[in-house]
Each structure stands twice: as C-alpha cells, then as structure tokens.
Amino acid sequence: GVVAHIGEDLKKKPGFDLKEGDKIVSLVSLSMTPLKIDKILAIHKDIDRVDIVGKAILFESALYAKMPDDMSEPLALAALDVAGAPAQARKLPKEGDSVLILGANGKSGVLCGWEAMKKVGPKGKVVGVVRNPKQVPGLLELGVYTDVIVADCTKPVEVMEAALAANDGKEYDLSICCVNIESCEMSAILPVHDDGLVYFFSMATSFTKAALGAEGIG
C-alpha cells in the first residue's frame, strides 16, 4: 500500500527512510496488523490474494520493504511473502558460522541460503537439505549453498548424520527450518551445538514437539 501518514517522532528518527506517498509492502502477519477494510475489489483464488480498499497501521518495530522498481508487483509480492525468513537469515549468523537450512529447495529456503551465504562469508558454510537428489545440481549452480545434502527431514538421525558429515563432523551454529510438513522439529535441533540457534519458519512446526524434544535430548 501507499504510506498515508507517519508519526512525527518517527520522522525524526536517524536513518528512517520512508516518506508519505512511498509504496511499501508490510512483512508483518495480517493476524498482527490492525486493518480496516472499506471495500473488497477482487479475490484471486489462484494466488491467494485479495485486493481491497482500506487502511492498516504499522508500528515502529514492523518489518516492511519498499516496492522495487525493477520487477513486477506480483513477482515482488511473491518474493517478499517469505521475507521474514531471509531477514532472520541475514540477522542471525555471524561471519564464519555454519548454517543448516532444511527445505533448501523452496522459495524461503533459497532466499535464506542467499542471505546466509553473504553473511557467513568465505570462511563459513551454508548447507541445504533436500529430499529429492534431482534438486541438488540446480541449487549448487545457483550458488546459494556451499553444499547440499539429501535426507528425509522427518527422520532426525538421518538428517543429523548427513549434516554433520557435510560439516567435517562439527555441529552447526544455526539451523533454519523451512520445511512445510510436520515432524521436522528434531531434524532442525539435533545437528546444532549447545547454545546454538534454531529458527523455525515453517507454519507446520509444533512448538510442543520442539520444546519437549529439545528437553528430552538434553
């Protein structure tokens, strides 16, 4: 949507780069966004999109992105739809870290790999996990992973063994789960060292399984 009004205090904040009239995309879940819908213009069932006339309120802490000028609106929205995960993939790793990405062939996985590769640098490692071996060559060609392994993310021991083998036997600093199926929680947790980070982006995540599983393995 188009920015209609900005609070005076926020306008004065150093580094704030928005102005009224800018076209932006909110990266905050609609379940957390105060939204007033005045009119529904169209419903696009094929792409899960609804065009409306209305107003939304974004708070200072909200993630957002300016609409790019060099791509179409549908393409930009498709890329930004999973922007929460790549934003964390940029924020969480440090230079030289090892990162494991489950669901490496999906849109969110590829974008996470791209951001993580830039952040960890040449001394770090970003390993993707896919289920289909046919996906490996294309992902390596894209250059978004240092290595891609084949494993079933619903089988934690299988994933752990393959992941550690791809990281010279070492546990990972960070794992990001982008798999859109259930029961992948332990596959994201097991390969990570004590005090490491596990980021669950998938909406299929059971945080009960994640919490109890992590507690159970110690």
Regions inferred by a protein language model and the residue ranges of each:
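Hydrophobic beta-strand signal
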Residues: 24-25, 100, 199
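Local beta-strand N-terminus motif with an aromatic residue
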Residues: 96, 145, 169-173, 216
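Short amphipathic alpha-helix with an adjacent loop that forms part of the alpha/beta core around
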Residues: 156-170, 190
